[in-house]
Amino acid sequence: YGITTIQDGFLTDSLYSLLKLFAEEKLLKIDVVGYVDLENYRNIYQNHSKDYVYNNHFRLGGYKIFLDGSPQGKTAWMKEPYEHSKEKGYPVHSDEDIYELISNALEDHAQLLAHCNGDAAAEQYVKQFTRVMENHSYIDSYRPVMIHAQLVREEELTKMKPISMIPSFFVAHTYYWGDIHLANLGEERASRISPVKDAIRTGLTYTFHQDTPVLFPDVMKTI
């Protein structure tokens, strides 16, 4: 049957309205799950609770945030500098901003997806999510997801298990940008991109994805 579900990973007002229209007109041929831009469009998720379940192949799945950029563009936030550089990439948000965004998602009982490529971004997400869970005594984390998780360290993977965080790996990345990763990160770090075996050893639930339209959706290049 091929690909039967797709995800829109950053819904805005205009995109939400478009997908709703497609659903109402019964134009969607496969299931579409939308994750709302939490920072700017929280109202979409809060005001449309009826869309939490499928209606003509469309539903809302939760929220999405971005914590850094990409390793090939040297904007992924790293703990150590890129090769032959003093630059480490940069964070999108401060720790306190991330703490507040996570708190908002859990307050709305919503799953939160966070774009994290660099090890510093992964550390920030895990640390702040754990802090929110502890400070507010939340019982359910609603299965938060670390999207890409390309350079997440084993230390963070271990800390993800108690909060039921799921790494979703972009494993096809090395096929397309492996030479750039070697140049930007060096052999030691580049060889650890998408540490699926570490996730398995840690006992984590994990998934694979492709970042269409960054890549054409060809699942065989992922598995």
Regions found by a protein language model. Give the residues of each.
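Metal-coordinating catalytic core of metallo-dependent amide/deamination hydrolases
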Residues: 12-123, 127, 159-166, 171-172, ...
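His/Asp/Glu-enriched, well-ordered alpha-helical/loop segment
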Residues: 103-112, 120-144, 148-149, 154-162, ...
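Metal- or metallocofactor-binding catalytic centers and their adjacent structured scaffolds
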Residues: 1
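Short acidic/polar active-site loop segments enriched in Thr and Asp
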Residues: 4-5
